[in-house]
Amino acid sequence: YTDGLALKALKTIFEYLPRAYENGASDPVAREKMADASTIAGMAFANAFLGVCHSMAHKLGAFFNLPHGVANALMINETIKFNAAEAPVKMGTFPQYDHPHTLERYAEIADYLGIKGRNNKEKLDNLIRAIDELKANVGIKRTIRDYGIDENEFIERLDEMAEQAFDDQCTGANPRYPLISEIKDMYLRAYYGE
């Protein structure tokens, strides 16, 4: 019973986060709505768990002192693309699913948010664009590198960071189970913006 909670939280975030960011304390309604969205999202993930985005964000924040929300925002697009793949190398750990339904689920999210597309792939692409727009509207930079993280240091720590993200408690609940090499690839794409 988590879908409705997650969808409500998403819609509220898309509607009120830019206002809360822009207006701060002068817009108590937007701040209240964001507190509600945070609580509702917490209720959803307390039952449905998190996934590899949070795993990677935990390590990105720990290794490079980035706030957890920023780290999640930096990793979300790559995670969505990874999860939406039609033919994963390895499935998630929940055996009741014979294949991932994530592309379809992301399209449902797009529909709920009023994001259009002629098919599920187009809805996915438009959802990612909407997320990029939301991030830009609240001051989230485009890449990990944009936060001043030195390329050599990032590459030097990448293997350890990817291994720790793989072992993070959230990874097992991801709908598509990542290989360590796939986690590294997601980090690299998020670093360079590719």
Label each PLM-derived region with a short phrase:
Residues 66, 70-153:
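Gly/Pro-rich interdomain helix-loop hinge
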Residues 7-18, 35-39, 53, 57-61, ...:
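Predominant activation on well-ordered alpha-helical scaffold segments within soluble catalytic domains
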Residues 153-194:
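Short, amphipathic C-terminal "tail helix"
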Residues 22, 44-51, 89, 118, ...:
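Intrinsically disordered or highly flexible coil/loop and linker segments, enriched in small
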Residues 1-48:
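Carboxylate- and glycine-rich phosphate/diphosphate-binding segment that chelates Mg2+/Mn2+
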Residues 1-3, 29, 122, 145-148, ...:
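Short coil/turn segments at secondary-structure boundaries
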Residues 39-72, 167-173:
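Glycine-rich phosphate/pyrophosphate-binding beta-alpha loops
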Residues 6, 31-34, 124, 158, ...:
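Hydrophobic packing residues in well-ordered alpha-helices of helical domains and bundles
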